């Protein structure tokens, strides 16, 4: 009948705007996107049974920034990275053997503004994405029109090398939101929220090389429409990109 049936729910989150499942399918992490107080952003950890759908609450940690909006976990399940949109920062957490989160081991702040005077009045960290080889953490900052490539050492207590960051600027007012990689790990796709632009890069030798920018024709055809883009996915065969 194609009906959806609830199999489990939890009350241990508030406004869970983004979540990530560990590669082994055993643990689920969700951010609590609180925006009323800079001290109230939280991230919650759950043990997850992928056969029954049951979620068992493990613990919660503060995100150390307002409006957490993204979370990712490395392929080994050792580090969780989350982005704080209004907090202008991102936090890194270690996990223990049960999947629980330690308090944040790194809190890394950004600054800067850009052309959109309504939205880009400060840094807005929007996503934290691990490179396919797990050697880098890519951080999209919508507020200052910058994509950051941070060297990342999975086993280090402080895995993010802040001083070693590479910065890729996008055109003023674009607002980079999410980045993802092709299944063959040869290309990266950067979705820009504010101007609905999709940028394509070659990923080779630990570096991004710009290739092209694609525009939503729906936005182009409506001169006065509000532009916006929110998520991006690549098909398993790598032939299609969806935004």
Predicted regions span which residues?
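Beta-propeller fold detector
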Residues: 3-11, 55-62, 102-112, 159-168, ...
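Blade-loop segments of beta-propeller domains
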Residues: 6-77
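Loop-centered beta-sheet repeat module
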Residues: 134-195
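Beta-rich, blade/repeat-based domains predominating
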Residues: 13-23, 64-75, 111-134, 170-187, ...
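Short loop/turn segments immediately following beta-strands, especially the blade-tip
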Residues: 1, 46-53, 93-102, 151-159, ...
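Short glycine/acidic-enriched loop and turn motifs that connect beta-strands
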Residues: 33-38, 86-89, 144-145, 195-197
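Asp-box/WD-like beta-propeller blade repeats and closely related beta-sheet repeat scaffolds
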Residues: 54-127
